[in-house]
Structures are given as structure tokens and as C-alpha cells.
């Protein structure tokens, strides 16, 4: 299945990938992404650990319906969370792209 030296090479690749993944996870934790709702009237910025860093609300919304504002804040947070997830997937996919895996072998992410 692995051929001559194949398992050793696979282990070496796995160790290299593990180092790259650790570095990538550290980079992702430092990322900040902003989600928006209400055509940019509400903005929520979160980091790679999904911790909310900032909430910006256009002053014009403070005079409006409280429930609508709450919905816009939730939608902006969900947009930011979706964006950070997409960024994480893209960065992690780039780490594993160079590793030659046996047919049918899937990575856990």
C-alpha cells in the first residue's frame, strides 16, 4: 500500500503538516473579521476564536424598533462567524494540499 519508504515519507509529511497547522491556528486566532447587516448599518467584528471585539451601530438605528436592532446585531454576528469559518477552512485546506495521501484517506477537517 505504501511502497518502499512510503510510510516513512508519510510520517514525515504528517509531522510537517502538524507544524504548519499549529502555525496556521495561531494565525487564525489573530484574525479579525467584520460581519454586517442592514446594508452596513450594524457591524460586528470577531476574532478567530469567535470572541466579539467590536459592535458598531449606526446612530439612526437607535431611534427605531428595539427588536429590529437586536435582529440586525444577531445577523451581523452570524455573518462574521460565517466569514471566519470560511477563512479558517481556506487556510487549513492550504496546509494539507501538498500532502500526498493514500487513496480514500481523509483528513479530520
Curated annotation (Swiss-Prot):
The residues forming a coiled coil are none
Q: Which UniProt keywords apply?
A: Cytoplasm, DNA-binding
Indicate the principal place this protein occupies in or around the cell.
cytoplasm
Cellular component aspect of the GO annotation:
bacterial nucleoid; cytosol
Name the InterPro entries for this protein.
Answer: YbaB-like_sf, YbaB/EbfC
Q: Where in the cell is it found?
A: Cytoplasm, Nucleoid
Do you know which Pfam families this protein is assigned to? YbaB_DNA_bd (PF02575)
- Can you tell which superkingdom this protein's organism belongs to? Bacteria
Residues passing through the membrane, by range: none
Question: Which GO molecular function annotation, any one, does this entry have?
Answer: DNA binding
Keyword flag Cytoplasm: yes
Family as reported in the entry's similarity comment = Belongs to the YbaB/EbfC family.
> What PANTHER family has UniProt attached to this entry?
NUCLEOID-ASSOCIATED PROTEIN YBAB (PTHR33449:SF1)
- Function of the protein: Binds to DNA and alters its conformation. May be involved in regulation of gene expression, nucleoid organization and DNA protection.
- What is said about its interaction partners and assembly? Homodimer.
Could you identify this protein by its name? Nucleoid-associated protein YbaB
Gene this chain is encoded by:
ybaB
